[in-house]
């Protein structure tokens, strides 16, 4: 069992939360990411149930976290963090429009996906996407890649090699817009 696993286990045990396959995927991710220089800012696209936010707080405690997701998922994430007593309300900022300023004392910035353009050119050091691109259309994925590239960050992406969406659109990992 890795140190990352042990850290997650302590936090999850305190809140009577079980480690599941999604948590394990994030533990493996942080076991890889902890080998990079600690980023000052990280953006997670499509975190679910705060798996990434929690791991980031444990692995890179000095980094600011940008979490972008559907509004209803962000509400759920906020409630999880509140219940687990991981961050105080004073450390969390919710972005309401593209022109909001990032407040200096905020640790976690929550961005509803309908205003994703807020993330353009924010000098974010690391972007992470684990299993949420496979739920988006290729047009939406291309929009995220444009935002990611505008920040010139490291990018960690873990999604299926192939997925057919409900509407019939087929996604191929190798066909994501990786090039510059």
Locate each region found by the language model.
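Conserved class I S-adenosyl-L-methionine
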Residues: 39-48
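Conserved Class I S-adenosyl-L-methionine-dependent methyltransferase catalytic core
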Residues: 1-37
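A conserved beta-strand element that flanks and buttresses the S-adenosyl-L-methionine
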Residues: 128
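Conserved beta-strand signature within the Rossmann-like core of class I S-adenosyl-L-methionine
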Residues: 151-163
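Conserved SAM-binding loop of SAM-dependent methyltransferases across substrates and taxa
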Residues: 49-61
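A short, conserved alpha-helix within the catalytic core of class I
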Residues: 135-148
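Conserved SAM-binding motif I beta-strand of class I
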Residues: 64-70
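S-adenosyl-L-methionine
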Residues: 80-120
